[in-house]
């Protein structure tokens, strides 16, 4: 009898699936989601739009109206093209697949977004992690040395970084781009609505840079839409490994509709930026808590015992992310999403119990 062990790659057999906990009944502050629903009139209008979507037809592979709207709203340079993905996760997988030549490597600062390493492993690429400094800032000298030593195919720079919230200095990013002449530098701006800084306007100035974004953190995590901006010479190659019809018709219609009303989402992002400042101050005042600077919609917090804090919050029905085992630099760290005022109040009340 044939078994999975006879067929599946050994490295895949040794892996575990990406864990997504059941959040039913919890204050959900573990996944950097926008806590705000659409205003009722806008939600009703969206429902009316979606009711007329042709569900019996395959989606357009390059929906012109949606791409034009993305260009207009985000200021995509005229010389750049746009490639859509089923979330940025799919785009990361496509990049790895397209670049998976024998001996090719992927390089990124660590701790960082886990999908950079996972996608490299799935494509059988070597992943090179360059540790941040102890204060979780970028070690530019180590990055430049690693670029010279490994000459990776792909270099990921999360701007800002997840899970640390670090926003790397522009001059360091420029030095990395210049040093990565043999690489493609992918600047991941998933949290741009909260960082208020971007490399997208400069995407056409470099022949080895693409900028990746997602609609998820802006408030549309449920529709799964990511997009890659870069020179056509790059995007035409990545498009070859894109699954046909990868972005469904409901996602396309919802994204186009909401980009026409992006001021609502932008206002929500502004609320969360203000709440981030207040929440960081309040958590930082608790005994034993150290809050790291963040340019995302989340805070990284070091506590005396991350596992104990996580367990107390679970008891209080507040779900956060215990990242303390992800990397040695994250010892006793938890990551909390900035939520609504009510959610933040619940979080603070639970943290006061965990950090008396």
Curated annotation (Swiss-Prot):
Pathway named in the protein's UniProt entry: Amino-acid biosynthesis; L-histidine biosynthesis; L-histidine from 5-phospho-alpha-D-ribose 1-diphosphate: step 7/9
CDD domains assigned to the protein according to its UniProt record, in alphabetical order: AAT_like
GO annotation (BP), single: L-histidine biosynthetic process
Modified residues (N6-(pyridoxal phosphate)lysine): 217
Co-factor requirement: pyridoxal 5'-phosphate
Keyword list, A-Z: Amino-acid biosynthesis, Aminotransferase, Histidine biosynthesis, Pyridoxal phosphate, Transferase
The protein's Enzyme Commission number: 2.6.1.9
Top EC class, one word: transferase
UniProt-listed InterPro entries: Aminotransferase_I/II_large, HisP_aminotrans, PyrdxlP-dep_Trfase, PyrdxlP-dep_Trfase_major, PyrdxlP-dep_Trfase_small
Entry-linked Pfam families: Aminotran_1_2
Subunit-structure text: Homodimer.
Record-stated family: Belongs to the class-II pyridoxal-phosphate-dependent aminotransferase family. Histidinol-phosphate aminotransferase subfamily.
Name the record gives this protein: Histidinol-phosphate aminotransferase 2
